[in-house]
Amino acid sequence: MGADHTAGYAVATNIMKVGGDVDPLKSEGQVALSRDLQVTTAAVDSTGMCLFIAFAVMDQADTFQALLDLITAFSGAPCTADDVANLGKSVLRNERDFNMRAGMTNKDDRLPAYMLKEKLAPHNIVFEVTDEELDQVHNY
């Protein structure tokens, strides 16, 4: 909840190509990538597992199945990929609801203005995701 360097850890996909391939220098695909990674991270965190397993889980079907088997063994109920996604979405909805009740709004999801204006070397780009696109991160 709040700023978290591990939630929506797009570096994994943008740079290391784990779980897909999205160009880190373009805005296209970043919102969906962030949303999906936040869902995954919330689910993995809820199991008590460290985020580091996410890299293996995203790229190796056998490892993902091992996570499902572990959750099934722990809970006593069969666990599917949809169940894991729904767990992550539920966590994020609860966090979002808490924040909204605490008085936060979409304006609190915005990055500092300088990130929209000051070019970052060595690629000389700025954050180009619009507010409207950014608001879509919370559409699970």
Residue ranges and their predicted role:
Residues 1-140:
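Extended C-terminal regions of large enzymes
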